[in-house]
Regions:
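Eukaryotic charge-rich
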Residues: 61-64, 71, 75-76, 92-93
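General small-molecule cofactor/ligand-binding pocket signal
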Residues: 87-91
Length: 94
């Protein structure tokens, strides 16, 4: 539908917008588009390693039209993030 197409276009342009939920220091290079189940990951970090560990963060960001709701999967992700249930894993393949 036209609403879906408009939403998909706006999702991709979000890094270039001004909005209260977008920190002013984020640049478009700080954003990675995912699309599904969340729209973006924002890498809010610093080049200095110690400062980064102290104040840097990774932001999961979803773009919604004014009245649309999070999907069940998006709510689950939000709840796990808020509960601190995130871990790092690395897989090395030879």
């Amino acid at each position: 539908s036209a609403h879906t197409s408009k939403g998909q276009i706006l999702e991709k342009w979000t890094p270039f917008l001004t909005h209260p939920e977008i920190d002013e220091h984020w640049t478009p290079q700080d954003w990675s588009f995912m699309g599904n189940p969340l729209d973006h990951i924002v890498w809010d970090w610093h080049q200095d390693r110690d400062l980064n560990v102290e104040t840097g963060k990774i932001v999961f960001l979803d773009v919604k039209a004014a009245k649309s709701q999070l999907s069940t999967k998006q709510r689950r992700i939000r709840d796990l993030v808020k509960a601190g249930r995130i871990e790092w894993r690395e897989i090395r393949l030879d």
